[in-house]
Amino acid sequence: MSKTTLIYVAVVDDDEHLCRSLGRLLRAGGIQPITYASAEAFLADTKHPQFDCLLLDIQLDGMSGIELARRLTAEGCHPPIIFITAHDNPDIRAEAEAAGCTAYFRKSDSGAEVLDAIRRAGGLNRTI
């Protein structure tokens, strides 16, 4: 009998409906999501498990997903980061890539593609 290791993913998005939808999608895919309504809420949660991947909305109220990624990098944390956005444009995409994203999706992209990217990123070491 093989033992399955859970993949823990932080989902940071201020759209409550999207967080619920992503949570259902990830759980159905065997991934354990923990959702946060803001970057600040994520940073304030000191009792979270080690995450295998972060799924960050780019345009959040308060600190943006890109600012959160930069802050984590400055603090020596280098988790795999997947950015999602409803407002795609070349400048935002370039900024996300400069912040070190593993993958980048529009919120309208396929859930299967997002799951595949998380599974690939989840194979990396837990870093936060």
For the regions a language model picked out, list residue spans one by one.
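Non-catalytic signal-transmission and effector/linker regions of two-component phosphorelay proteins
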Residues: 1-10, 16-23, 38, 112-128
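Acidic, metal-coordinating helix/loop segments flanking the phosphotransfer/catalytic sites
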Residues: 35-53
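Acidic catalytic/metal-coordinating carboxylates
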Residues: 37-38, 64-67
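Short amphipathic alpha-helix used as the core "switch/output" element in two-component signaling
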Residues: 44, 66-77
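Active-site residues of response regulator receiver
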Residues: 57, 85
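Receiver (REC) domain active-site loop signature in two-component systems and cognate sites
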Residues: 60-62
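Alpha4 helix (beta4-alpha4-beta5 surface) of REC/receiver domains from two-component response regulators
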Residues: 67, 88-103, 109
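Short, conserved "switch-loop" micro-motifs in signal-transduction and mechanochemical regulators
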Residues: 75, 86-88
